[in-house]
Amino acid sequence: MSGYTAFFNNFLGKSPNWYKLSIIVFLILNPILYFLISPFIAGWCLVIEFIFTLAMALKCYPLQPGGLLAFEAIAIGMTSPAHVKAEIMASFEVILLLMFMVAGIYFMKQLLLFAFTRLLITVRSKIVLSLSFCLSAAFLSAFLDALTVVAVIISVVMGFYGVYHKVASGNNFDDSTDITNDEKIKKDQQVLEQFRSFLRSLMMHAGVGTALGGVMTLVGEPQNLIIAEQASWGFGEFFIRMAPVTVPVLICGLITCVMIEKMNIFGYGDKLPRKVWGILAKFNRAQQQKMNRQERQKLIIQGIIGIWLVCGLAFHLAAVGLIGLSVIVLTTAFCGITSESTIGKSFQESLPFCALLVVFFSVVAVIIDQHLFGPIINYVLSASESTQLLLFYGFNGLLSAISDNVFVATVYINEAKNALHAGIISLEQFELLAVAINTGTNLPSVATPNGQAAFLFLLTSSLAPLIRLSYGKMVYMALPYTIVLTVVGLLAVEYILPGATKYFSSLGWITALPV
């Protein structure tokens, strides 16, 4: 074996050769574009290349190729280490959340699996079950972070998959097996594929549910807090101002959930195979039969900690990550988990994504330093007031689908506020634009996994390859939701929002405050 062959085999491991060559071409091309043609073009190429690594997540985890591209971008001067650090520190709460909250949810898996297994066994209608997942995710995301909600549902779905896979492989419920190996399930491949399709649809319904609920409240998404702070809105006023857009969108989103399940389109409609239902029902009975007082106490303790988790997040008693750390401490202490190796397993899911998110912040720093969104922002602000709402909504949605939601919302709300202080727009127009920015950032961005952090977390989780959920599959399955949420949101911003805002103001429900 030659040195070149050995190097090429080592580079990005078992990834396809065409993929390795693509990354090498990107690494050669970017400095040439940056130094000889245009930093602006080089910046946009980097963004497209990073999206490519996300799209190929099942070929190679995006951390390595994306990290190489980001490292090179910093090395050639497209951004600086100081700026990357500033972007990381600005989103440090999100990193804390990933480090501790996802690990905390791991230790509540027993309670979650118990509760959702009962739901899955009791509710036989796929449409009702899909609505249950979508609505519960929307409700939870209105008060909790969407990443936390998705982490909970991933944990549950992983539990379902693991139970069936063990039995289908000829093992018992308590046996330790490799759930990534399907060699022993050859005779049940059709059942397994149908089960995977069933789980994919539940995950997508829940994922979209987090967007439907997260846009409605002050605490639903990180960018909501930024927008509310700039507009001087409290919890109640934020909800009322968003309602003319978010309520019609929620209703239409739920109708979409029912229709796509009923019509068996866009990868939805597959029901839970009867054989899998039987295994899960048997698992539920076995768990109840062997449940002694100690096991019941563990469920009660996890339930109490779950109440603390919801209350702590809803009332912002501490940073999300710190509440997650408290969940780790409380569940492990009172459920008797003291082994370092067992505790270490809880961090396996979140830390690779945490590292990937830091790489993503490097790309965001390049977007800012190279002013990649500058022409779009200038065009929107130069438009007439009558078209500004639509343009703000539309371009926020477009940019949020390829970049960080928090970054896009921050840039646009700051530009809108600068225009207000410069006398370019009125206070009333600024308040309408704030709603357009918030809804535009949150709703159309369900189109792609990199549009929503929760979707990106799902795509790069260990569950995604198990249920065959790729980037392309997520985009395809999200398409009906993307169309409905975007169009209904756009129509609501244009035709319902201005009149409803005036009506709420006349009732005294909202007040225009100087900002």
Swiss-Prot record:
GO terms for molecular function: sodium:proton antiporter activity. Belongs to the NhaB Na(+)/H(+) (TC 2.A.34) antiporter family. This is Na(+)/H(+) antiporter NhaB. InterPro entries: Na+/H+_antiporter_NhaB. The chain crosses the membrane at residues 23-43, 44-64, 88-108, 119-139, 143-163, 202-222, 238-258, 303-323, 324-344, 357-377, 389-409, 447-467, 477-497. It comes from Mannheimia succiniciproducens (strain KCTC 0769BP / MBEL55E). Its main location: membrane. It catalyses: 2 Na(+)(in) + 3 H(+)(out) = 2 Na(+)(out) + 3 H(+)(in). It is found in: Cell inner membrane. The gene is nhaB. HAMAP family: NhaB (MF_01599).
